């Protein structure tokens, strides 16, 4: 019974405790702050939030933070017992690439429940602040010096050289934004009017992280009075043999010029590069509007060039800087290619051109190839433009000689560079499918006719041997045992062959019949002997037959 009462008493105390705390706080429960926002600009970390109950006064707010891998919460320095709805915790040394969590609560004698902010990574949430801008005026140009808004920024320590800047400039009198340019941290805006006020604003961007900053405050400056000597214009660089030729235009004669160069990558680095410009050998104090210097003056790379004019008393401002790429300005060599011939097409494989020492030339800019081909017996040319290095030339005739030549062009129209044509290479296409079919048919016919040809040849040889090389006759001693004479040559005119005749005599009347028959045969043979060429043979035969008749009569008697 005591246990039951004790349990009931405990339940009552637990239920009453919140009521007691609420009464101690003035009879109201504190609510957690809402809509907490984290704003990070460069290295400045700002927290903002809203009160849940404006009617409750003298309420303070405190923040805790927690890093990844931590179990406990740590008080956020600079954001403890804050009476306003904003606090700055920039003094906290955080790893800007490490994820953190924040939580906030309201406090007045008692405390509200914690309100947790979604975890975030400072670098991803940070924005690029407005850069600092310093201006210098010339008569037709403005020199701009840009530096980060926060010096030695921790947030952008690894990306200081990756910033790009964009500029918006306009005449102050018009108020219309005229030009938008991408610029370096040290830049010069050309083609302005003298004694004119221009206003501009600049913002930074970090393209590698897809971050766009906010614009700087507007800065205005007035250009100076026009200088007596204008700067040189229209600067161009060309290649002749193993030298660079630098040319420019100028209004006045009897002037002296000098040319300077600077590594282009230095423009991306913050700082003053005024004293890093260097003179080009053979281009100092020249009296003409051009200068020539050897290619070995510059190693492979990108440079900036500028020219200045002087008459001995006055000096012009520096000309507009031009970009000079040794790879692009170098002489563009013709391509090297190999041809694989088919029956109705060529496969052309294009390779890098070769320089002295048979080493390939490495080209860091994209090229397109112009291929011209024609029949060796004709002057009608056809042209193909290809970006690929594996090109097929279709619709060719079988067993025909075609010639091919090629040259390279830069794809960038601003460069407008082309090589000379390569030497022409001539190749003969292979036989077509029709020729192969006829060849196969011819072989089959020849194989089929071969036995007949062999047989006909054998027969012909036998005839030749039989006519011109007959077999020898047997001797007279052997020949008398054979009554049948050998076959005569059918192709030559010969006497009639002798035929052995046999008679069967049954009675005397038969003998008379035989005699009559013999007489008839004799008359017929005599008639035939008049038309025969060999009459001697028939007379021999008659004698033989008459003898035979007499012998038969004697045998019968």
Curated annotation (Swiss-Prot):
Explain the post-translational modification. Answer: Ubiquitinated, leading to its internalization and degradation. Polyubiquitinated via 'Lys-48'-linked and 'Lys-63'-linked ubiquitin chains, leading to receptor internalization and lysosomal degradation. The 'Lys-63'-linked ubiquitin chains are cleaved off by the BRISC complex.
Residues carrying a glycan = 50, 58, 81, 88, 110, 172, 254, 313-314, 376, 416, 433
Could you tell me the keywords of this UniProt record? Cell membrane, Disease variant, Disulfide bond, Endosome, Glycoprotein, Isopeptide bond, Lipoprotein, Lysosome, Membrane, Palmitate, Phosphoprotein, Receptor, Repeat, Signal, Transmembrane, Transmembrane helix, Ubl conjugation
* Stretches in topological domain Extracellular: 28-436
MF (Gene Ontology): cytokine binding; JAK pathway signal transduction adaptor activity; type I interferon binding; type I interferon receptor activity
User: What is the official name of this protein in its record?
Assistant: Interferon alpha/beta receptor 1
> What residue ranges lie in the Cytoplasmic compartment?
458-557
Instruction: Return the InterPro entries for the record.
Output: FN3_dom (IPR003961), FN3_sf (IPR036116), Ig-like_fold (IPR013783), Interferon/interleukin_rcp_dom (IPR015373), Interferon_alpha/beta_rcpt-1 (IPR016669), Type-II_Cytokine-TF_Rcpt (IPR050650)
Q: Which GO terms describe its cellular component?
A: late endosome; lysosome; plasma membrane; receptor complex
Name the disease: Immunodeficiency 106, susceptibility to viral infections: An autosomal recessive immunologic disorder characterized by increased susceptibility to viral infections beginning in infancy or early childhood. IMD106 affected individuals may demonstrate adverse reactions to vaccination with live attenuated viral vaccines, most notably measles, mumps and rubella (MMR) and yellow fever vaccines. A subset of IMD106 patients develop severe reactions, including excessive hyperinflammatory response, encephalopathy, acute respiratory distress syndrome, and multiorgan failure.
* Cited function: Together with IFNAR2, forms the heterodimeric receptor for type I interferons (including interferons alpha, beta, epsilon, omega and kappa). Type I interferon binding activates the JAK-STAT signaling cascade, resulting in transcriptional activation or repression of interferon-regulated genes that encode the effectors of the interferon response. Mechanistically, type I interferon-binding brings the IFNAR1 and IFNAR2 subunits into close proximity with one another, driving their associated Janus kinases (JAKs) (TYK2 bound to IFNAR1 and JAK1 bound to IFNAR2) to cross-phosphorylate one another.
């Amino acid at each position: 019974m005591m246990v039951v009462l004790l349990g009931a008493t405990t339940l009552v105390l637990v239920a009453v405790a919140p009521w007691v705390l609420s009464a101690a706080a003035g009879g109201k429960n504190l609510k957690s702050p809402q809509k907490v926002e984290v704003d990070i600009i460069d290295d400045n970390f700002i927290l903002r939030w809203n009160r849940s109950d404006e009617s409750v006064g003298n309420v303070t707010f405190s923040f805790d933070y927690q890093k990844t891998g931590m179990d406990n919460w740590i008080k956020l320095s600079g954001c403890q017992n804050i009476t306003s709805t904003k606090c700055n915790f920039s003094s906290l040394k955080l790893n800007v690439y490490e994820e953190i969590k924040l939580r906030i609560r309201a406090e007045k004698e008692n405390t509200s429940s914690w309100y947790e902010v979604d975890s975030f990574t400072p670098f991803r949430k940070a924005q690029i602040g407005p850069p600092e801008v310093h201006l210098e005026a010339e008569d037709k140009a403005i020199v701009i010096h840009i530096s980060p808004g926060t010096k030695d920024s921790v947030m952008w320590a690894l990306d200081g050289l990756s910033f790009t800047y964009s500029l918006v400039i306009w005449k102050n009198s018009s108020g219309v934004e005229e030009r938008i340019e991408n610029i370096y941290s040290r830049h010069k805006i050309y083609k302005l009017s003298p004694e004119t006020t221009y206003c501009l604003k600049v913002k930074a961007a970090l393209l590698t992280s897809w971050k766009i900053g906010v614009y700087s405050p507007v800065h205005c400056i007035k250009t100076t009075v026009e200088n007596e000597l204008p700067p040189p214009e229209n600067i161009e660089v060309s290649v002749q043999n193993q030298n660079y030729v630098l040319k420019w235009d100028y209004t006045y004669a009897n002037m002296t010029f000098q040319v300077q160069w600077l590594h282009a990558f230095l423009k991306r680095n913050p700082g003053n590069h005024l004293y890093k410009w260097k003179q080009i050998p053979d281009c100092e104090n020249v009296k003409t509007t051009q200068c020539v210097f050897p290619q070995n003056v510059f190693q492979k790379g990108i440079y900036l060039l500028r020219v200045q004019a002087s008459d001995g008393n006055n000096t012009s401002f520096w000309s507009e800087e031009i970009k000079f790429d040794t790879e692009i300005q170098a002489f563009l060599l013709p391509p090297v290619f190999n041809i694989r011939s088919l029956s109705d097409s060529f496969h052309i494989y294009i390779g890098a051109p070769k320089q002295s020492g048979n080493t390939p030339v490495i080209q860091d800019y994209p090229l397109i190839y112009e291929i011209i081909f024609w029949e060796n017996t004709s002057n009608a040319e056809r042209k193909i433009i290809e970006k690929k290095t594996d090109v097929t030339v279709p619709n060719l005739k079988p067993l025909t000689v075609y010639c091919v030549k090629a040259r390279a062009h830069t794809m960038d129209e601003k460069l407008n560079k082309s090589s000379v044509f390569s030497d022409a290479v001539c190749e003969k296409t292979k036989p077509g499918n029709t020729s192969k079919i006829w060849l196969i048919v011819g072989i089959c016919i020849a194989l089929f006719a071969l036995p007949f040809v062999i047989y006909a040849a054998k027969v012909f040889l036998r005839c030749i041997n039989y006519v011109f090389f007959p077999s020898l006759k047997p001797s007279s001693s052997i020949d008398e045992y054979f009554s049948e004479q050998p076959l005569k040559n059918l192709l030559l005119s010969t006497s009639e062959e002798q035929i052995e005749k046999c008679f069967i005599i049954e009675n005397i009347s038969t003998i008379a019949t035989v005699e009559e028959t013999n007489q008839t045969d004799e008359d017929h043979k005599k008639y035939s002997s008049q038309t025969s060429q060999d009459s001697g043979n028939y007379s021999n035969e008659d004698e033989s037959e008459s003898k035979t008749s007499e012998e038969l009569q004697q045998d019968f008697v």
